[in-house]
Amino acid sequence: MPYLEERFSTAMPPGSRERRPRVLYLAYYFPPSRASGVFRARATANHFAEAGWDVTVYTAPREFFETYLDDACDRSLEDTVDPRVTTVRPPMSYYAWEKDIRQFGKFRRNFPTVSASLYKLFQSKVFPEHYLTWIPGVISSAVKAHFKQKFDLIIATGNPFVSFAAAQALGRLLKIPYAVDYRDSWTFNQFTEELKFKEDSKAFEWEAKVLRDASEVVFVNDGMRQWHINRYPYAAERMTVVPNGWEPELLGEGEYAPPVESRPLRFGYLGTVTSYLPLEELFDGWRIARSHPLLQDAELNIHGHLGFFPGDVAPLKERLPLDENIGVHYRGAFDKTEGRELYAQTDALVFCVPGARYVTSGKVFEYMASGKPVVSVHKPHIAATEVLEGYPLWFHGDELTAEDVAKSFIAAAEAARQVDPTRYAVAVKHAHSYTRAATLGPWEQRMRKLVEGTS
């Protein structure tokens, strides 16, 4: 990948110290995983490495993704990790995921019910997350690595949130600062806006402890930050927002292409299809919009995985009107590195996300970077609208109804046929405010000052 090789030079930045600051980055989901949070984790590790840090990533064992998650991998992503990043995969127990009785320990084989009860009790009393078994290997390995070559900083990204607990434990043990990055919320559901745990759960006790000691607490949008300020006001001054973004080294710097009027319009949804998406409103709106001359023969192509696990595929596929002859096609999954070509082949993009005010979605940044019309299919006033404000090719309704969705499709179709170089340039300029370098840069600088102030 020449564009990646060119980006990942080995030169130190001007004015850098002789010894690079060393960061331990705890990111359970990291390439080759294809989980949605991987892209932010990958970008963070790469950005810090490019800024002159010595980056060590602790992530899950490869077999977790390949065996226990049924090969939920995108191996092309591994090629996009900066070669200066060191990746370590501490071992762990797969108790919660192991289904092969031949792999059970003697006690679990002979007393499965008792074993399950003890495991559940242990979680409720210690840490309510299956990934807890990752912590011992992380702490053991990190302590040994630290005494060989000192870490200056720990950054943990969640979910899962055992990474936060490990960061807090290591920070106290090694007496170094740590920051936590909330890609998702820990104790409340971003989609239903309800608490995930009872108030007396260990999860709240751990979250309070983590936020009490963290040097910085990062969120992907201000809605999430405000929710946590209300619950943990003592940490408010250390809470910041680092938005998601997009990667020019993956998507390339697009060029204006005049509308192709000799073929039907191609609308595209690029991303994982999940049960939370408002698919009924999307396809009902599409059916109505098809009565417009510009959309009578248009295509709506779905690119991406159906859910995150094998059991998600069948029920999600049933919700796609593939047999109605209305131009809806499921094109299958694609590697991250294939995204550039798919965006180039698409005339307008469909931004369909769950309707919660705390949801941004990383995909919206790539959509804007394409310079193509974007059709919003979600409730109004979600966090993503803060990002889309100012994007000149954004089409959305006042409500999440089939009628409003249809109007947005029609407006986007007209824009796709009429877009000119000037409007395209304004759209791309807006997107450039959200490159990973733009969003991660100020955070990296704050972390550098933090390290320099404690060294």
Per-segment meaning from a language model:
Residues 43, 125, 140-143, 162-165, ...:
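Membrane-proximal helix-turn-helix segments that form the acceptor-binding/catalytic region
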Residues 301-306, 310-338:
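Nucleotide-activated donor-binding/catalytic signature segment of Leloir-type glycosyltransferases, i.e.
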Residues 102-153, 199, 203:
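Conserved nucleotide-sugar donor-binding subdomain of glycosyltransferases
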Residues 399-406, 417-448:
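A charged, aromatic-enriched C-terminal amphipathic alpha-helix characteristic of glycosyltransferases
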Residues 24, 259-277, 283-287:
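Conserved donor-binding/catalytic core segment of Leloir-type glycosyltransferases
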Residues 2-95, 216, 437-438, 455:
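N-terminal subdomain of nucleotide-sugar transferases
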Residues 215, 325, 341-358:
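Acidic donor-binding loop of glycosyltransferase active sites
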